[in-house]
Every structure is written in C-alpha cells, then in structure tokens.
Amino acid sequence: ASDVYKRQVQVPGWVCCPREDLKERLASGKACDTPLEWPLLTHWLHEMSHDQVIDYMKRYNMWNLPDDKVKVIFVPCYLDGADGIFNMHYYDLLIGMDLTVYASYYEPWGYTPLESVAFHVPCITTNLSGFGLWVNQLLGKDGELTDGVQVVRRTDYNSSEVADAIKDAVTAYAAFTPQEAEKIRHKAADI
C-alpha cells in the first residue's frame, strides 16, 4: 500500500467548513420564511458536484420545500462536539431523536443500532447486521417496530422491498400516539 494512505484519515464526506449563513441564522434565533441556498446541507463540501449523496438528492428533487413530504438534513461530518453547527457529540443528539434507521447492507455487528436502543431510541436495521440477527434470535422472531427494533429482511435483490419496509415503518411510527411511542422506547431500551 502507498504511504499516502497511511497518512490520511477517511471521513464521511469531504467537508470544507460549516456554513456561515446557517450559523448566522441559528444564532439570530429569528424565524425565516426564505430558505438558504442548499437548504438540506449543514456543511459545505469540497467538490460538491461529485458528492454522491447530493447527486441523489438533486436527482429526486429533495429540496426541503414547504410541500415536500420528506425533509432531509445532510450532515456530512462526524458529530464530535466541534463541527461548527451542532457543536454536540453524536450521543447528545441521538437522545433527541424519535427513531433511527440503519439500513446496513453488511456489518459484522453494527454498533449504531445498539447505541440507539441504549438511549431508548427505537430503530430500524436489517438482518445483514450482526445486531439485527441478534435481536431476531433474542426475540425468537423477526423484530418489529413495536418490539423497539424492526429488523428488515435484506438481500442482494430486494432494494425496493427494503425501501418500502422502511417507509412503512417510519410512517407507522409517525402515527403512534405519544403513549405508544413511549412504550416502544422502553421496549427498545429493554433490548
């Protein structure tokens, strides 16, 4: 292997810097009725025209418009407490989430869904993560959202079915009453 790879750190996105316009808006505390340019992005990226996530969002017209049913916040950096926008560690943000999705194609274990349930946040994962397989074994069945962890069956050939299962689970969770959601949070923590 080349020595150049030994000196580099691989990161989720090629982050340039936190967005100053977003920082100013957040600091002002004022409600705004006009979106920022690139309203779904928290940090500027180097070579944004080559970023696969941004390309995907453009292809599917994901712009966080008022009538859009799906809103996206793309955070392309590690949440280490010093990112310039949130300035909170990942775990401090995780506890404020209602539901997490880790649609792993393959992870020997998959710590992120485990971390989610440890903080009482229900999650959706797949049977291709070790954690998903463990949950199924623990429950004696495929995990369902009402168990605190939904384990979606994933193969090399069922991407559409996986996407539909995730969509259906998120929609179902959004329809739960606060009492039902709280019960599911406790079940997630029990796992």
Where in this protein do the model-derived segments appear?
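Generic recognition of flexible, low-complexity loop/linker segments
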Residues: K58-M62, M88-Y90, Y111-P113, Q137-G140
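Intrinsically disordered, low-complexity cytosolic loops and termini enriched
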Residues: Q8-K23
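Catalytic binding pocket for nucleotide-activated donors in carbohydrate/polymer assembly enzymes
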Residues: L99, A103-H186, D190
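Short, flexible/disordered intra-domain loops and linkers
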Residues: K6-V11, G81-I85
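Donor nucleotide-activated moiety binding/catalytic core segment of transferases
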Residues: K69-E107
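Short, small-residue-biased leader/transition segments that mark boundaries at the very start
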Residues: A1-Y5
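Long, low-complexity, polar/charged, intrinsically disordered or flexibly structured peripheral segments
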Residues: E24-I85
